[in-house]
């Protein structure tokens, strides 16, 4: 284990032990009833996804929306890559090789996508983590850990090489996007993926690309009297400070890569981002609010609790800082504030003002599944408070009550917001659909059983310490 990885692991243990205060229960005390209930729902989701799978010449695909089966994406957010990650997680939870075979079928299709440049060349976000080929790489790495065929690892090498070819020297570093800084669409996500590959495979080329991408992002910082922030888009002054499109996500990437590469300038950039987040935070009565953003009238006075624009995601940034030893004491305070707030804003019901009901109530990106995932991870293999268990179980029940369950299958039908096209939808993916809800439920199952997370997404600070062991060996193939 390299020194940087060892440091992250040691700090993560301290983080888990120190963050959560007085405890009155442990996961072992919860019994196996909740574990069985969670796994049953996760497998019902898997059966529904399997029932919507389509076999083609290259492998297995799923429609992004089961009610509109003609739209099939390859990406991590909504497409095939996300379902591949889910079936690998389900395999890890159950040991059922049929789930791994389903994941391999999806991974075979993704390899075919990489062989056909027309699949992604016209995508302006082609390099990105959630909407480009970096997300394909995440899915392939999940499969390669368990597959005997090394072709998935070779395809990851191909992605790293392609990202190297696409990179553009700019501002003392490298970029891939002409427009986006952020985690979902932009250079932050691409650089994070490359660091993820480096951690799992000891790929020095990937780490060099990641580090240079982080240095470009460092140059995109907007200085203020209280720290630095990053715009979502370079051509428009949209300041969305939370995780998915702004400062928390970009600074998360700087903290991650800075720690892996032992680059103090990147760690300092993450610290400046944290200083800015602290400066805009509103703390009252032990509750934390972080504004949605600035740049559109509709964002004024808006606060959310979800992964994308609220506390569930930005708490991951605070956790990454603490794990990485960057302003660890202050970061611990903000982890605690985030936790206390989520426990006291009336979830899983209508959130207490000024927190708003998000555009998608249940999903992993905006809604309650993101909170469930975070709460579950906070209690992995550690003592856990009654309050966390109560909210965790209440969110699971809320999600179950909204599900359509027939013939041992489960899915959700929702009214899609206008920015997603409107109408009724039964989404299948990680961001808005069954796979994302399923991953949150599997996080709960893992936490009850004291297990490591079954999935290891790059933007999850909790999964990295135990799961990245430089043992995939892709460069040997």
What are these regions (language model features)?
Residues 28-477:
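Glycan-recognition and catalytic cores of secretory/periplasmic carbohydrate-active enzymes
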């Amino acid at each position: 284990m390299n020194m940087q990885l060892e440091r992250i692991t040691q700090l993560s243990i301290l983080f888990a032990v120190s963050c959560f205060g007085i405890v009155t229960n442990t996961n072992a005390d919860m019994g196996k009833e909740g574990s069985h209930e969670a796994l049953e729902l996760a497998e019902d989701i898997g059966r529904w996804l399997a029932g919507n799978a389509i076999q083609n010449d290259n492998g297995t695909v799923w429609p992004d929306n089961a009610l509109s089966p003609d739209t099939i994406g390859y990406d991590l957010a909504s497409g095939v890559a996300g379902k591949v990650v889910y079936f690998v997680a389900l395999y890890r939870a159950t040991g059922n090789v049929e789930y791994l075979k389903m994941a391999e079928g999806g991974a075979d299709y993704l390899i075919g996508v990489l062989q056909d440049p027309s699949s992604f060349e016209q995508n302006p976000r082609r390099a990105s983590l959630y909407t480009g080929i970096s997300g394909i790489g995440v899915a392939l790495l999940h499969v390669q850990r368990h597959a005997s065929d090394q072709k998935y690892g070779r395809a990851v090498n191909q992605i790293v090489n392609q990202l190297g070819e696409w990179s553009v020297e700019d501002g003392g570093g490298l970029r891939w996007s002409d427009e986006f800084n952020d985690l979902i669409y932009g250079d932050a996500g691409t650089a994070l993926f490359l660091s993820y590959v480096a951690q799992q495979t000891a790929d020095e080329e990937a780490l060099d690309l990641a580090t240079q991408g982080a240095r470009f992002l460092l140059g995109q910082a907007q200085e203020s009297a209280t720290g630095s922030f990053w715009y979502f888009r370079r051509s428009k002054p949209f300041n969305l400070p939370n995780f998915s499109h702004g400062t928390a996500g970009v600074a998360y990437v700087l903290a991650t890569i800075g720690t892996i590469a032992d680059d103090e300038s990147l760690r300092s950039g993450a610290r400046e981002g944290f200083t800015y987040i602290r400066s805009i935070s509103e703390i009252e009565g032990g509750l934390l609010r972080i504004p949605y953003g600035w740049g559109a009238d509709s964002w004024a006075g808006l606060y959310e609790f979800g992964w994308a624009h609220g506390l569930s995601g930005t708490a991951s940034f605070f956790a990454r800082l603490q794990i990485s030893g960057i302003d660890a004491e202050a970061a611990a305070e903000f982890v605690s504030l985030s936790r206390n707030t989520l426990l006291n804003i009336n979830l899983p019901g209508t959130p207490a003002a000024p927190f708003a009901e998000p555009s998608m109530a249940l999903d992993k990106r905006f809604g309650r599944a993101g909170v469930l995932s975070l709460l579950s991870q906070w209690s992995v293999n550690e003592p856990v408070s009654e309050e966390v268990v109560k909210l965790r179980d209440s969110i699971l029940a809320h999600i179950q009550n909204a599900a359509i369950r027939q013939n041992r299958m489960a899915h959700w039908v929702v009214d899609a917001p206008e920015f997603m096209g409107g109408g009724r939808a039964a989404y299948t993916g990680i961001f808005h659909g069954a796979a994302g809800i399923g991953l949150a439920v599997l996080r709960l199952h893992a936490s009850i059983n004291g297990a490591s997370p079954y999935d290891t997404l790059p933007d999850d600070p909790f999964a990295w310490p135990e799961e990245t062991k430089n043992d995939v060996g892709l460069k040997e193939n």
